[in-house]
Amino acid sequence: IKYFQNLKDSYKDKIHIHIGVEQGLMRSVADRVNSYDSAKQLDFIIGSSHLVYGEDPYYPEFWEKRSAKDTVLTYYESILDNLSCCHNFDVYGHLDYIARYIPANSYSYDWHDFNDLICIILKTIIEKGKGIEINTAGLKYGMPEPNPCLDIVKMYHDLGGEIITVGSDAHEVKFFAYRFDVVADMLKNAGFNYYTIFNERKPEFIRL
C-alpha cells in the first residue's frame, strides 16, 4: 500500500489516485476481515463472495454435490451469512457472481427463483449503510448483462439503495474500465442519477 501512497503523493497535482482492496467475505475469516486496518489510508474496500462456505464455484466439482439450482440458493444464503458477521467493507461486489459459473445444460439461471432472498440481502446491505458494485466483467465473459443483472440493480434502487460503484474486474490492462461507456445508461435505466466513488472510506456521488 505504501507504493500506491507514494504514487498518490507524487501525482497529486495531476490525477486523483484512490487506493482500495477487495476482501473475500466468509464467516471463517470474519475476524480477519473486520480487523483489517483501514487506517492504512485506504479509500475503498469491496467485500465479495468468491467462495461458498470455503468451496469455489469456479471448479466443476463444486457443482457435483447438489442440483445447480440448490447450489445457487446456497450461494445466496452464504451472502446473507457473510453480511451477518463481516462488517469492514463499503460495497458488496458482483452480487450474482455465481451466475458466471453455472454449468451449461444444468440449470437456466433466473434470479426470480431467489427473489425473496435477494430482496433480504439488498435490504440488509442498505440497512448497514453499505452499497453494491455493478461489475462489467459479466459482459467480458459473454454474459448479456453485468453482475449483478440490471433487474437486481433496479430492485436495489427501488428498495432505497443509493451507493453504487462501477468496476470491471479487469485482471488485465486491456480490460480496464471495460464497457464503462454503456454503464451510465444502464444505471439511468435502473433509476440512478449518480454513481459512487470513495475517498477515505466515505462515499462521494458523481452525477451520471
Q: Model-found features: residue ranges?
A:
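A metal-dependent hydrolase metal-coordination microenvironment
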Residues: 1-77, 173-175
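Divalent metal-binding pocket/active-site signature
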Residues: 40-125, 131-146
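Residues that form or immediately flank small-molecule/cofactor binding pockets and catalytic motifs
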Residues: 22, 97, 200-202
